[in-house]
Amino acid sequence: TPLHSSAASDVYKRQQSSRDTARNLHLYEIETSFFKFLSPRCKARVPACYFDEFDPKTGDGILILEDMLPAKQIPQMNGCSKIEVSMVLKEAAALHKSYWNDEHLLSYPWLTYSVSEERKKFVTDLLPVAYPEWKKRYQGRISEDIFEMGDILFSNYSEYSNVEEGPMTLIHGDLRLDNLLFTDENKRAILLDWQTAAVGLPLNDVAYFISTSFANPNDREKEEERLVAQYHKLLDVNDTYSFDEAWSDYRRASFVGFIMAVLSAMIVERTDRGDEMFAVMAERSAWQALHLDALSFIT
């Protein structure tokens, strides 16, 4: 095996509470398995993996990945430009096309945790406890319009989450600026942090990324239909998946960022930066969902 002059390692050893959550959600197993089994045929830009190991007994693992310096990260709360959004959507299209309707994905148990009865029960049991506490935490910080939207969404969550139609592919599951790097070389974005990779609906990644990446909701409103059309063209499966279908799935998926922000805020270790970041993510995604009338899918 050749030695590499530059590499970056990720060793999964954090505070016990964080490790317990990660173990319960299979996060470390998912990421190491992605690099072992699926990254070699991923057309999106991801770091090369030189070594991976996961111990299911302890939940510890190691990844040694390609060093991506001098690539840069854009802070989540800052948001990014429409050009940078386009760069990421190009990679999202490449990712989704690589595994489009590939039923072999279902043979990997670690890739189906997010759609398993175990995960559905986890979320269904957590939401009635987490959402009221989330509202209490952000009272006075988050708009009442957003709270009202959340009340309706989570009262109808079983209906919202019960989606049985649509294209299937490998999705990143947490496609946002904190999990990306940008490089001037070939003007490409690099996708990192695959702990939430899953079999899922492709527009979940797209809506989540667009909603959380524009600091100004007016900019998002002006650009998002064009950006989704660009993604759909790059996906190049028009014969089986029309733009109208993609746009409808995008509108429905606009809740994804809000749900992720609420749950993440309540299960990860709390910090001042984390509190504000999850508030910003929830706001951006909620304004997107309200603008796109996503509640019409469940009411």
Residue ranges, per PLM feature:
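ATP-dependent phospho-/nucleotidyl transfer catalytic cores
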Residues: K72-H172, D184, R273, M277-T299
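ATP-binding pocket architecture of kinase catalytic cores
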Residues: D10, R14-E29, K36-W110
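Helix-rich C-terminal or lid/interface subdomains of diverse kinases
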Residues: S86, K233-T299
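Conserved catalytic motifs of the protein kinase core domain
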Residues: A7-A8, D60-G61, G166-M168, K187-R188
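Catalytic activation segment of kinase domains across protein kinase-like and atypical kinase folds
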Residues: D178-F209
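Hydrophobic HxD+1 residue recognition
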Residues: L175
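Single conserved hydrophobic/aromatic residue that forms the stacking wall/gate
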Residues: T1-Y12
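Active-site activation/catalytic loop segments of kinase-like enzymes and analogous catalytic loops
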Residues: S33, V199-N238, S254-E276
